[in-house]
Amino acid sequence: MFDNKNILITGGTGSFGVEFVKKTLANFKPKKLIVFSRDEMKQWEMAKNYPNHAALRFFIGDVREKERLYRAMSGVDFVVHAAATKIV
C-alpha cells in the first residue's frame, strides 16, 4: 500500500507518529516518509534512530500554519493526520 509512495505524517514525533514511522519503515518501502511536527529536538532524536533510511524526511511546522502545511503536502500521496495539542 505504501510502497513507492510519498507519505506525510502530521504529529510525526508524537506517540502515534513514532510508532507509525517505525512500522511503515519496517513493512514498506516508501519513496518519501515526511515527519511533520513542531518539535525540532524530537525530530533530531528520531533522525538519529534511522540513519540509513533515505526515504525519511523531516519538516518543522505547525498544522495551524496553512502555507507551511501546504508546502509539506506538495507531491504527497497519503496524509496521516496525528497532530494534536497536548493539554496536561
Task: Go through each PLM region and give its residues.
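Phosphate-coordination loops involved in phosphoryl transfer and adenosine-cofactor binding
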Residues: 3-5, 30, 76
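Conserved glycine-rich Rossmann-like NAD(P)H-binding loop of the short-chain dehydrogenase/reductase
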Residues: 25-42
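Conserved Rossmann-like nucleotide-binding pocket used by diverse enzymes
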Residues: 8, 34, 59
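Catalytic, metal-anchored helix/loop core of enzyme active sites in primary metabolism
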Residues: 1-4, 15, 55, 64
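NAD(P)H-binding glycine-rich loop region in Rossmannoid oxidoreductase-like domains
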Residues: 27, 50-88
